[in-house]
């Protein structure tokens, strides 16, 4: 069950990622999902707090996009479960 969290979406140069930083029953976790490939590029990883989760998810996404020669765009974080 999700207690609180944030998410961001990246759509750039054919890439589509979703970044998450959430506090749930397992604690605070971060993850990054590749929507196009339908797979996790960074599965749930424990972090200290939501802010650290945002930083780690951003770093994972940046590294992933660099491999595709794409620059990380500015992120807009939204409250979890919002559209």
Q: Model segments located where?
A:
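Short N-terminal "domain-start" leader segments
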Residues: 1-29, 83
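Mixed-charge, Lys/Arg-enriched low-complexity segments
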Residues: 33-83
